[in-house]
Amino acid sequence: MKIEELQGYLEKDGSRQRHFLFLYPLLFQEYIYTLAHDHGLNGSIFVEILDYDNKSSSVLVKHLITRMYQQNYLIYSADDSNQNRIVGHNNFFYSKMISEGFAVSMEIPFLLRLGSSLEEKEIPKSQNLRSIHSIFPFLEDKSSHLNYVSDILIPHPIHLEILVQILQCWTQDVSSLHLLRFFLHEYHNSNSFITPKKPVYVISISKENKRFFRFLYNSYVFECEFLLVFFHKQSSYLRSRSSGVFLERTHFYEKMGNFLVVCCNYFQKTQWFFKDPFLHYVRYQGKAILVSKGTHLLMRKWRSYLVHFWQYYFQFWSHPHRIHINQLSNYSFCFLGYLSNLLINLSVVRSQMLENSFVIDILTKKFDTRVSVIALIRSLSKAKFCTVSGHPISKSIWTNLSDLDIIHRFGWICRNLSHYHSGSSKKQSLYRIKYILRISCARTLARKHKSKVRAFLQRLGSGLLQEFFREEEEILSLIFPQALFRSHTGRIWYLDIICINDLRNLMIDHKIKPYNECK
């Protein structure tokens, strides 16, 4: 199925502006469920669902579509006691299939908009635009001139109707909105995915319907960031357009163009409130960083704005202390698995002119990133590779695998951790993590063969594990010429890492997935 064949569901009156029209009929197409189960559309932004049930065959999909044509299965009422409804916690598998198909159908317009936006701006389609490692070179370039940083945790208890209203601004397909409302209330009643908290309901992204709830969460974050970007765009003296190339920014500026005429006059008196040409905003998942060259008072104004915005727009009360304001030179913030801070180096230069001598103090600022060893040990502990204190233990559930497969799994994790944390200024911190994985691998092999670790290593030799735990520098030396490699022995940022994976979900059903790939 090609993308061009889907445009008929989205275009309106032959205009170039695409709307979310006629999405509901897509649920009756077999290829939608194929996209949800397989690799997405033409290798695009769709995420593969690794834990999808093997029962999702073409026969079941056809049976599901046949049942959906019988509209009585989709009718729901408060006193409905019919146990044969196609959607609900009593028929969880079909509910999961429909919710994933619904999420895919809602993602398709975003894909088409992204493609058209890149073509209009003549931006080549490249995976490098999606790399989260590209954030750190940006911070290295900008942070030396900034003063304050704010850690922001985006609030996520949100009322169900707010989610429906958010999507209502994007789509004119009433049937899809009714289906979305039905899904949310059905999951709430089953107490599986939405748990009640007065007066709102909390969405927890579950493994069973991860794609569906990830789409809803991204829609919510989209609205959270919209006015923030709008105010910054209006108040900035240097109007940068570079952020328009990012995936999450593409739709902001399309919506902003329609919103600008209405809001420009209304917010004209308050724009001076946020004037700051050196304000930078970076977000990954539910955590955001706001850095500024302005004063502490200006950062407090931004915090007040965000708190009131969440309160009046999303009906969510957030305590102001949820947003921390710190001086960048005296604070280390954790972001994307790195501990980052601003190092200040003092250099004394003595200058002499004729009979007079001068002593000049020179301050240089450098953005520094280090590995958060405690966080990595915590992740290894949750994945059952070590104890909470970092003592290696055997991976008992892998003892039924072959020796080569066990070593390959441990080596894969070790290499991917080294690959992701290659930007650390102190790579010696990773030695402890590699030691934990090596000893855990040896303990797992020894447990499988019912022998002691020392005796097992002496029998097979210490070189058994060396091939699978190569250092990142050794791999780079094989790729690049020796002269070029020596000049790049410092921090390295890779542009092929698009998300952070959890170690607990790194390998599912004996399938190994890279650490730098989405689940």
UniProtKB/Swiss-Prot annotation:
Q: Where in the cell is it found?
A: Plastid, Chloroplast
Give a GO biological-process term: tRNA processing
Primary residence: plastid
In its UniProt record, a GO molecular function of this protein is: RNA binding
- State the InterPro entries in the record: Domain_X, Maturase_MatK, Maturase_MatK_N
Q: Which GO terms describe its cellular component?
A: chloroplast
Question: Which keywords does the record carry?
Answer: Chloroplast, mRNA processing, Plastid, RNA-binding, tRNA processing
**Membrane-spanning intervals of the chain:** none
- The superkingdom of the source organism is Eukaryota
Task performed by this protein: Usually encoded in the trnK tRNA gene intron. Probably assists in splicing its own and other chloroplast group II introns.
Q: Which HAMAP family match?
A: MatK
Per the record, the similarity remark reads: Belongs to the intron maturase 2 family. MatK subfamily.
Name the UniProt record assigns to this protein? Maturase K
Taxonomy of origin reads: Eukaryota, Viridiplantae, Streptophyta, Embryophyta, Tracheophyta
Gene name in the database record? matK
